[in-house]
Each structure stands twice: as structure tokens, then as C-alpha cells.
Amino acid sequence: MMENQNEGVYVTLSELLRFGYMPKNFTIRPSAAVLSKLSGRHLSGVRGRGMDFSEMKQYVQGDDTRNIDWKATRRTGKPYVRIYNEERDRNVWLVISQMNSMFFGSKERMKSVSAAHTAALFAFKALETGDRVGAVVYNNEEVKFFKASSSKNNVVQIMTEIERQNHLLKADNTNNSKGNLSESLKILSSLAKHDDLVVLIGDARAMDEGSARHITRINAHNDVIGVII
């Protein structure tokens, strides 16, 4: 009964782990920085490349017609197809806010709950695609860091920390500081080296000049997705 009363207000570990069994009809292979907006569990605006372009060759029977390069075909008068190499696995870094400003929402769920759901969705999608998952979970007072790993147990630990910080949220908490987004990004800027994916999950309250500088530095050699709750 108590769990039903708290549904949408607080998350549970079992609730987050269920995302591992849900269909995830999106890609985490963006070709450029993407700013997405998420409501509940529905993600939009994330477009992926999936494969890296390698070379062009003349079409032969059996080639995938979806890869025909129509510009080259028109120019030469002969059908040409683009050849792709599958991308390597990479680190997917989740930066999850459980700040006091996230303890607000609609009748359906709190923003803090939506952020937790989003993190679970991305984490299990990354595992499905063979990527490694790391995370920084932060609130107004603390930052918890998890190294990137392809282990499901690592994701369970991340979800456990999200649940813990989520249950610290209270309506009467008066700490309205900017939180630890800048500190979280500072940690990541030294870890996300090249071709990693960084997913920022939260509201805009924690953003400041320091955070913006770190994001610019990270985005120079990595992909960054912002999920605004």
C-alpha cells in the first residue's frame, strides 16, 4: 500500500531494473550533440549514425539498396553504394540530477522520478549495444561517481545510488543551491577522452558558467545529449 502511495513521488530499485526488460526504440549513436526533451518514458529527437562511413563502391547485385548514394549515382550515371564500418563500443556517461529543484512535477510523477527512469533507460540501452556505462549522480550536497563498465552489476549499483539520493528528497528541504553539476562535469572532463557519449539528465536550474565551460570542453571530442526534464 505504501509503495502505491509513493508511486510517481519516489522510485524503487526494482522499478528501475524493470527498464532492462522494456523495449528501447531509440539509438544512442548520435552524429552530433542533440538537445532532447523527455516526458515520462518517451524519448524524441535522438538521431543516430550507428555506423561510420568507410568508402564508396559501384553497386553489385546483393548490395543493400538502402546504402545507394544517389548524388554519386546521378553524377556518374552508374549506381554507387556507401560502405560502412560498425562503430566500436564506447563509454556512455550518465550525469543524473536528484537536486531539490527536481522534487516537483505533474500528477503523474516528479521530475526526479522521470530523471531516474531516463537514466535507467539509457543505461540498459547501452548494455544492450555492448557499450560501457559510467555515471555521476548528484544532488545539492553530494556527488557519487561510478567508473564505466559493461557489467550489469555496475548498472545495478548506479540504480541503487539513484534510488538512495531520490529518497533523500523532501518537499520542505530549503537548500536551493546550484548543486553539483559543475563538479560532476569537472570529473567527467578528465575521463571522457574521445568518442564517448555523455548524457546530461536534469533541469536547467544547475547550469552555470562553470558547467557550460565543462560541457564545451567535453563536447569538443565527445557526443553530448541533454535530456531536459
PLM features: residue spans?
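N-terminal juxtadomain amphipathic helix
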Residues: T65-N67
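Exposed, interaction-prone extracellular/peripheral surfaces
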Residues: M2-G45, Q58-D63, A72, V81-H117, ...
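Detector for the canonical C2H2 zinc-finger "Cys2" submotif
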Residues: D52
